[in-house]
């Protein structure tokens, strides 16, 4: 019942309250209190070992240090990430100093050997948005060289051999076949694919110090197994399993395999003797210990220890005689799900499993028999247009319907769209039906008077669109080119100051080009640290109909890092031209207007601008489930524009400050709203002008 009205705020919470007497917030608090009690009882029965943490400056926000891997110079290479940090390769020195090496975009872990670092990285298909690849990237710490070893691969969990010459990785191809693969670490060529006849799901391969064996986990329906494979012989030896333990990150140490397991109910580091198959508890920590990496010749274990503010790097001595035999350790998993299983269990599991599921006939897919999914609603603020709508797709995502409404802040008009896209070909084809208002505001330079003309437009258009995506290292790129033609009917025109504005029809042609490139950012960043955007718009009406017009606009933005953390400096240049002499139709302006001024129409505009954006505070304050105040931010700006209005030049200059509060409404995490105020000093008028802002739009 709740699912049918999922679009209505708090539907699930109200249903819970009606059914069990507790809403979502109350149920969450009850659950946390219950889990806290159970966790304390669990901790009392599990030993906690002392580890030595690498001293670092305490972070202000949640920050993670993953996958510690010691280097020959005494430093420790880690992956650092968090609310305030992008994924970085960082050297940690014993005294706590951090030396950032570079940003990177790993799918998970990384691996280092012979001063080389490798990881797998997701890269999109250039054209098909739902198709992606996972390629192996390599970074040379000596030369600083970065390159991809594979193209359009399907690899994950890559590990360098101790001598840095080979890579063991898992390949999961488009036919859902999972294999262990050896690659050449210089060329990326496949050296060997190991047979996996049962198609077990493989994870976390790791090399033995001599490079002759590989340990990994194998998962099938019956559970996980810990397996050692001979590199040359391909012989497989299961050390234990299958088990329902979520064993991860195995590593060789002498005659042992170290690994992660939640056997005690808490993630801890364990060992198994490869000869006797006896298991031992090495490291147990209050909130979990992860990513073991032993240094055999020093008998030292590096790991990540979880704290309330994230993972921290720690170390401990490896003393096998002090390890705790698994037989003496009490397994106390919380099994919080157990009451539900007991409550819902059928009286006879064997009979249930035999008859629980219907047999469905396998038939060929027919594109004409579509299963439509209403899956998303959205708000898209893209100056000067604010749009909101919802999307319906078919199962293959080749056809999409969108119904939306947009508000043009320059004209203060609203329109409604129904759009159909077909993406089964290259290019993409878009059919759009639009109905709504248009407006033009004419400015009389002599009398400084503004006159509005409003009319109604109904239009239909067909557009052909070529889209390309690209990821290279830490940069993402996107460009699109589209051309379109349409039919527009105009009604209700009354103003004729720039020609004979007639009701009637027109056949518009349009051209759009967008090019974007930007560097990955942290969650708290306001803008990219490095990024570029170029937009080109062109419109014309075919001669011979009641209305004719021409329009051209070009805009470029460059983002730079600022002086402080999460600060940005930006520069913008924009130009726009509307044909006037001999033309009686004005296309809508495609660009934001000069900050600090209310929009009016013009023949030409050239605008340059600078801005500096920075966060002020993070209130982290909530008004129940209705509003969550996330961030207060500011933006100092300067705009200088030269306009041509009624054949006269009009310079506009403004300097000012935007203050905005970023917040979430109704516990909706996907959309961050922004509201604020703009205070601008206008040079020509010698006054201070104040505007209210919503999503960056003036109200």
Regions found by a protein language model. Give the residues of each.
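Hydrophobic beta-strand positions that form the internal "hydrophobic ladder"
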Residues: 76-77, 117, 167, 214, ...
